[in-house]
Amino acid sequence: EHWARLPIQSTAGARLATLAWGTSVSLLEAFPNCFPQRPYVISISFPEFTSLCPVTGQPDCGTITVEYIPDELCVESKSFKLYMFAFRNHQSFMETITNNVLEDLRALLNPCWCRVKGLFAPRGGTRIHVFAEAFKDGMPEEQSALVRETVRSWKSEPDPHRP
């Protein structure tokens, strides 16, 4: 097999698994990165994200975009889609969702760098955008410099997911 089913070991994945809305969201699928020697960015955008406001119970809609530089593993896109759909009936703040997605992907993939952008549609006249990112700890200095340069270059490019 060129990919493996890997359970998320983080507490963030466990939180989702204990919500018991009938869907298995504690597993994401990953496959080996064929180019671990080269820092490159993978960007996945999910424009149909929905969850529920924990205060009002009203739906929150938006786009979740994940950008990461893989190390040994890459996330499989169908499993990511199913993971995103699992939030549909989950009540949580937008800031919490964005950070939980980051931590779940870090636990699964251990990427060199990962950023999650939660671009939520306005509700009550207020638009909320949440950005959370992290670099892998303990990278050799040369690799870290190359990864940071790749990230800097990537961030200077126009957003590929905006029309």
Label the predicted regions.
Residues 2-163:
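N-terminal intrinsically disordered, cationic/polar leader segments
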